[in-house]
Amino acid sequence: MFRFVALAAALAASPPPPARPAFHAASAPLPPAMRAELTARGVWRPGCPVSLHDLRLLTVTYRGFDHRTHTGRLVVGASATRPLTTVFRKLYALRFPIRDMHFQHAYGPGSDVAGNDDVSASFSCRQAVPSPCTKGIATGSWSMHAYGLAVDVNPRENPYVGCGQTRDPRARPYFDRTRHRPGMVTGRLVQAFASVGWGWGGAWAGDTKDHMHFSANGH
């Protein structure tokens, strides 16, 4: 009895676990160094549907696969900053894990390093990627990523699929969407994007589904 009372007293005297850091978000014009890097890497170039002045650096708090709090940076269209702040605030509250949201891993020299291909990112001046059902490499139309109005979330865990195929063979373990694993898109994540009017590629009609992809117009 004495040992039980002593243990209870010790537990009562223990400090509470540290509070989880509060969510933080901020947006700003792209710094000159980032503009230069995006241009040097060909992520932005003359002829893109938006200028560098139309893009913003969105900094948000997110929860990693290590259960820790991290700071991520996304290059997004100016009009996307407010809705995406709302979305990532909800994802942080839901404790939804994101593998990586590091600027250098998405756009810098680190983007060429093996293992840095599970990065959640937004802007990329490129055409929409054809369905894995085809062998094509371009569609002839701009992707919503080219406007900074789309986000890919955990690409490895949420592959772009069609006709039983994907363009990332390492994502094959995630073909089975009925067996949930950390980082896979959930209904609550879809609802978070839907609350700001953004659609999900996993809800496209037909066989082709882009499970990672969320955009302002649903395409």
Language-model regions: role of each:
Residues 1-16:
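Secretory targeting and sorting signals
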Residues 14-68:
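N-terminal module-boundary/linker segments of secreted carbohydrate-active enzymes
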Residues 63, 86-97, 126, 156-159, ...:
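Structured segments of extracytoplasmic/periplasmic soluble domains
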Residues 102-145, 158-160:
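Active-site-adjacent loop/helix surface patches within enzyme catalytic domains
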Residues 135-219:
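Catalytic cores and adjacent binding grooves of peptidoglycan-active enzymes
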